[in-house]
């Protein structure tokens, strides 16, 4: 996975490189302007510091949303998330300080999401073909067709892939949702109270 990290703190940039560089191609840039210059279709994931000189992380995320390619955008910030993140074109929001395990978990989540997206696209294409054939061919013709049987088998296999991509074993979902409070915590009403 190619990861672009836009972070104005040099020490933080070094940590990203140390933590992620062995497993991924990591490109480090010191600000939002450099991030926009470095961003190309080969970038799979973009870690953005929210408060950077030049273009802020929010401005970079807005610009990325206008691009034809669609890298995952993860905002990493010391700012407590507020309601303004609802409208931000980001895939994740991670509050600093971050550690290696959190970053790796975010990457795993994005990879799992990409696998699911790809499997789902293939599944829809196959089921569309199946529906088109079934709408035009008689039951008799369908029963005689080896291609139709192979297509049905491919649909079944792809359906299983989609189902397995929904619940990948390798993703630590407790980290994915660690910011989701339990009822009664941080102002969340308990519906059972």
Write out the residue ranges for each language-model feature.
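Receiver (REC) domain switch/output surface
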Residues: 103-120
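C-terminal output/effector regions of signal-responsive regulators
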Residues: 116-193
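Active-site residues of response regulator receiver
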Residues: 46-50
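Conserved acidic carboxylate
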Residues: 7
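Helix N-cap/capping motif at the beta->alpha junctions
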Residues: 28-37, 57-59
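Two-component/phosphorelay signaling modules centered on CheY-like receiver
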Residues: 10-27, 31
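A short, hydrophobic beta-strand element within the central beta-sheet of small alpha/beta folds
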Residues: 69-81, 94
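The feature encodes the CheY-like receiver
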Residues: 53-54, 67
């Amino acid at each position: 996975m190619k990861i672009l990290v836009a972070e104005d703190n040099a020490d933080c940039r070094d940590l990203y490189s140390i933590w992620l560089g062995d497993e991924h191609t990591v490109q480090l840039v010191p600000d939002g302007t450099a991030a926009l210059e470095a961003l190309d279709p080969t970038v799979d994931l973009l870690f953005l510091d929210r408060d950077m000189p030049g273009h802020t992380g929010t401005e970079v995320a807005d610009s990325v949303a206008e691009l034809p390619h669609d890298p995952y955008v993860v905002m990493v910030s010391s700012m407590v998330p507020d309601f303004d993140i609802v409208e931000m074109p980001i895939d994740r929001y991670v509050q600093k300080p971050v550690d290696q395990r959190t970053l790796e978990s975010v990457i795993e989540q994005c990879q799992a999401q990409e696998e699911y997206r790809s499997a789902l696209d293939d599944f829809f294409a196959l089921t569309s073909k199946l529906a088109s054939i079934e709408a035009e061919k008689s039951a008799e013709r369908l029963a005689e067709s080896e291609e139709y049987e192979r297509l049905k088998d491919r649909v079944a296999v792809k359906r299983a892939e989609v189902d397995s991509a929904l619940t990948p074993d390798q993703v630590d979902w407790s980290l994915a949702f660690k910011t989701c409070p339990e009822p009664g915590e941080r102002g969340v009403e308990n519906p059972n109270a």
